[in-house]
């Protein structure tokens, strides 16, 4: 039996610390690279080279980028691929179409997996939606995602939270129409998605009280993909979700 893959986490915030505990709890070797910011006098080539060297030195096979989105994520992804690691990126994906295609080409060249972490997609109920309702052409999709805490990221709620909702739609019922999306911080906690037909609710999923080990399941899906099992949550998927977020944002402001 081969040893399970080792992980290296890039980041030092709350999410990076949480992921460290979860990954270690799955009996995986895990190390951390906390210094992930580009220095003021460091060009992007030197930045990539520094991170590449640090990831090679970690001895890991999978890099998990636990950082806020931005242009640096594409550079960090490139560094991980150059180091020969598989890569998990946190949602939302802000890379351009050109960036996405370039990184996917590099991943194919290196024969490495590029995954985007949308945690709710491995819920039993979401997978049941895909089985029972896909593609959902005659259905309407809606969702609320409200958090009582404040937003530490400065990312608009529709992008940071709404992408969770629209990722569920894209995975389970991509042909459905979007009837309602509401997201925000500083409100009573609510994480709910539903599908309707003709004004009648067919099914709803409470994302707040599921109690399922969804991060661990996502890890198993990633590790399964390294053995050749199909993996749907790649950059193409993330880019489709971000396009849906932008389309809904335009629709609401138009």
Locations of the language-model features?
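Oxidoreductase and adenylate-handling cofactor-binding alpha/beta cores
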Residues: 122-144, 159-183, 244
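Hydrophobic beta-strand scaffold residues
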Residues: 30, 47, 87, 113-114
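C-terminal helix-rich "cap/oligomerization" subdomain common to oxidoreductases
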Residues: 1-4, 62-67, 112-113, 221-254
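Beta-loop-alpha module in the N-terminal Rossmann-like domain of NAD(P)-dependent dehydrogenases
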Residues: 41-88, 92-106
């Amino acid at each position: 039996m081969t040893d399970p893959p080792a992980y290296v986490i890039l980041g030092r915030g709350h999410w990076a610390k949480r992921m460290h505990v979860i990954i270690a709890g799955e009996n995986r070797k895990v190390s951390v690279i906390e210094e992930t910011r580009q220095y003021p006098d460091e060009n992007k080539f030197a930045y990539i080279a520094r991170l590449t060297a640090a990831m090679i030195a970690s001895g890991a096979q999978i890099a998990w980028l636990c950082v806020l989105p931005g242009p640096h994520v594409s550079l960090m992804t490139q560094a991980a691929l150059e180091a020969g690691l598989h890569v998990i990126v946190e949602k939302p994906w802000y890379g351009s179409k050109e960036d996405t295609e370039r990184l996917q080409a590099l991943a194919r060249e290196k024969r490495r997996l590029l995954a985007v972490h949308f945690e709710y997609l491995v819920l039993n109920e979401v997978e049941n939606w895909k089985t029972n309702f896909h593609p959902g052409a005659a259905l309407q999709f809606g969702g609320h995602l409200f958090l009582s805490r404040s937003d530490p990221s400065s990312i608009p709620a529709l992008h940071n939270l709404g992408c969770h909702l629209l990722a569920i739609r894209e995975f389970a019922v991509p042909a459905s129409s979007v009837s309602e999306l509401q997201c925000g911080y500083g409100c009573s906690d609510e994480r709910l998605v539903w599908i309707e037909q003709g004004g009648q609710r067919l099914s709803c999923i409470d994302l707040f009280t599921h109690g399922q080990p969804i991060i661990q399941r996502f890890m198993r899906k990633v590790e399964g993909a390294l053995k050749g099992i199909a993996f749907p949550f790649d950059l193409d998927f993330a880019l489709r979700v971000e396009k849906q977020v932008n389309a809904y944002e335009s629709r609401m402001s138009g």
